[in-house]
Swiss-Prot record:
EC code(s) of this entry: 2.1.1.228
Name of the protein described by the UniProt record: tRNA (guanine(37)-N(1))-methyltransferase
Subunit structure: Monomer.
Biological-process GO terms, alphabetical: tRNA N1-guanine methylation
SUPFAM superfamilies noted in UniProt: S-adenosyl-L-methionine-dependent methyltransferases (SSF53335)
GO cellular component terms given for this protein: cytoplasm; mitochondrial matrix; nucleus
Organism: Thalassiosira pseudonana (Marine diatom)
């Protein structure tokens, strides 16, 4: 039996750009018009292999369908010899949608026939339109955008909120990606995308909602503690839970200690340090002075203290500027064993608040400072040494004493640790050291009430502006 078809190895192929992939409406149950080839059933595998770049491929979806009953295929010009029955022996192979959205059936077919893969007259004659009913199946939704470059393979989860950082290549598919994430993760209720950098001292970032709704987290669990927070108005990063646990474990080794958390947020360090539910509670007596400038974070810090049985004599909360808080600790002679400064964007600059520090003449007590910051990634020992020198010099500049860390690393117990990978060229670091005695001889930084009020007012306005930047695209618009 001979079929008048061109040799498949002579057919050109075509790879469609991301814009050729199914739009969000693909997931709505409806009859869609797809271009298709009418082929002999016995050559199905051969066709699929040769035209793999243009054949419709979607996990758990068929690319080959039987011919529909009641449809007249007599217009197809490919002849069958020897009594070959095209109604039984041929199948429809769906081809990916091209740039034909919004056009009628005739325009679609005309446009598709202009593709190089169909220029062979005998192939063009096999082309027909097929109405296939493809309904929504949540289980296959995440695969809709798998061919878009840079679709995130992972994302941060905070309670029922998924946080993604989409690249520009993926933005045309952002609502589709958001829906896919929700479909595959029933416990999630909302997906947000970061649309700007963290540029204020509250560490909040402008975001848009891609799918779902509800940024108020009723309950978020981390290392045995429960937290409430509003993801849009306070800072929370679930990827730092390892760092939270590490510092808590390190600080609670002695039988008793005092901690000053200058940028405490909603309490990821302060709460587990002082919670009566923590395993170390009856072994180590920890008193934590926890501060945050953001009034909303301060409110949730107090709420989380109650949730986790952090008693008032163990966890003392403040709503002050970071520098003012550090001055207060020294002025009131609170001999903290550790200062935590988790504000990576600018924490090293806050070290100027330690200038003119009054050490205890009797004990000579020097607190350990834990400063989080960002710096470049390194590829070898030479680059690492250069990076560490740069980070320490940045701290020295704020302390007002050159060489007090770089030249006295062993004396001041200097340690630099990579906390996590932030980006292709950036790491988050934790720099720990004992407060150098040299800072006592540096002129103290003066904080006037007027300047503090002005600075605090500016920061609060920045925070509210940032919160207002949460995109208000309606759920209806996202789903359309």
């Amino acid at each position: 039996m001979t079929h008048h078809l061109a040799p498949l190895d002579s057919l050109p192929t075509s790879i469609y750009p991301p814009s050729a992939y199914p739009p969000p409406s693909f997931f709505e149950s409806s009859s869609l018009i797809y271009p298709a080839l009418l082929i002999p059933a016995k050559r199905t595998g051969e066709v699929q292999k040769t035209l793999k770049d243009v054949i419709f491929t979607e996990p758990k979806r068929k690319s080959v369908y039987p011919l529909e009953e009641g449809v007249d295929y007599s217009s197809i010009e490919v002849s069958a010899e020897g009594g070959y029955d095209p109604m039984k022996e041929r199948k429809v192979v769906l081809i990916r949608l091209g740039d034909i959205a919004g056009k009628n059936e005739e325009e679609q077919i005309t446009g598709i026939k202009e593709d190089p893969v169909f220029q062979d007259a005998r192939v063009k004659s096999m082309l027909l339109s097929a109405k296939i009913n493809i309904g929504a199946e949540p289980s296959t939704a995440p695969n809709a955008a798998t061919n878009v470059e840079e679709v995130p393979s992972s994302f941060e989860i905070a309670g029922h909120v998924a946080h993604v950082n989409l690249r520009s290549e993926s933005l045309p598919y952002k609502y589709l990606i958001g829906k896919a994430i929700l479909d595959k993760n029933p416990k999630l209720r909302v997906v947000v995308n970061k649309i700007g950098n963290i540029e204020n001292e509250f560490r909040t970032f402008p975001m848009e909602i891609l799918a779902g709704e509800g940024l108020d987290l009723d309950l978020l669990k981390e290392h045995g503690c429960r937290f409430k927070l509003d993801f849009a108005k306070v800072y929370w990063n679930s990827r730092l839970q390892g760092e939270h646990a590490r510092l808590v474990q390190y600080i609670t080794k002695p039988k008793e200690c005092i901690v000053a958390d200058a940028m405490a947020g909603v309490g990821p360090f302060a709460v587990p340090l002082t919670s009566a539910l923590a395993p170390h509670y009856y072994k180590t007596t920890v008193v934590c002075h926890a501060n945050d400038l953001n009034p909303i974070s301060y409110k949730y810090l107090q709420t989380n203290a109650q949730l986790n049985r952090c008693f008032a004599d163990r966890l003392i909360t403040y709503n002050l500027d970071g520098r003012e808080f550090i001055h207060k600790m020294n002025y009131e002679r609170i001999e903290a064993d550790h200062f935590i400064m988790n504000l990576p964007q600018m924490a090293p600059e806050f070290l100027d608040a330690f200038r003119g520090w009054k050490f205890d003449d009797t004990t000579g007590h020097r607190p350990i400072i834990h400063v989080h910051c960002f710096d470049e990634k390194t590829r070898n020992e030479e680059e690492t040494a250069r990076m560490e020198t740069h980070v320490l010099q940045r701290c020295e500049a704020a302390l007002g004493s050159s060489g007090c860390l770089v030249d006295k690393r062993q004396e001041n117990d200097v340690q630099i640790r990579v906390v996590r990978d932030v980006g292709p060229r950036k790491n988050m670091l934790c720099v720990s050291f004992r407060l150098p005695v040299e800072v006592a001889g540096v002129e103290k930084l003066l904080l006037t009430k007027n300047s503090d009020a002005e600075v605090n007012g500016k920061r609060k306005r920045e925070n509210y502006d940032c919160v207002a930047e949460v995109s208000n695209v309606s759920k209806k618009e996202r789903d359309s």
